[in-house]
Amino acid sequence: PQDLKYSGEDSFLEIGNFNTFRENVTISKGTKDGGMTTSIKDNNLFMTGVHIAHDCKINNNNIFVNQVTLGGHVNILDNVVIGGLSAVIQFVTIGSYSMIGGMSGIDKNVLPFSLAIGNRAKLRGLNLVGIRRNNFNKDEIKKRNSIHESFINRKIELSTNDKVEAIFYEYKSILNEELGHIQK
């Protein structure tokens, strides 16, 4: 593992089924501070030169375009696309069905269904392309757009935790799983 605290203890890399690793992909094993395991679930595509640091958790059906770099302890949920030459700082979670534009620097959690672009990346709206590709119907898209707009464009000044609580209360039925990774 590429962690200065690593002192030779047994650590692991778990890789699921149907993943594709192109040329020069590097993946670091886990460390003591991250449960000793880096894990990659199923059906992910890692294009040329991708780097996955220690203790990352990568779920299913994700695409990492050329030269994407993940810092340690990053969580990538399901159906995420990260554009080429993008970097994600350590301890960040990227929500399901999100898309990160190429050459972006991600230094904060990214909400599910979001489109984030830039250095430092900003949320630019709903990832409609990804949502449509995954066969969400019009009502589901409307609900997610409403949630996204509520979170991003709240007129009242609230802390992030207060925003999350308010939105959970308002849209509880579909948010439990989709935003459950954001901790108070």
Locate each region found by the language model.
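Terminal amphipathic alpha-helical/low-complexity segments used for targeting or macromolecular assembly
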Residues: 5-6, 12, 18, 113, ...
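Structural signal for interior beta-strand "rungs" in well-ordered beta-sheet cores
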Residues: 1-122
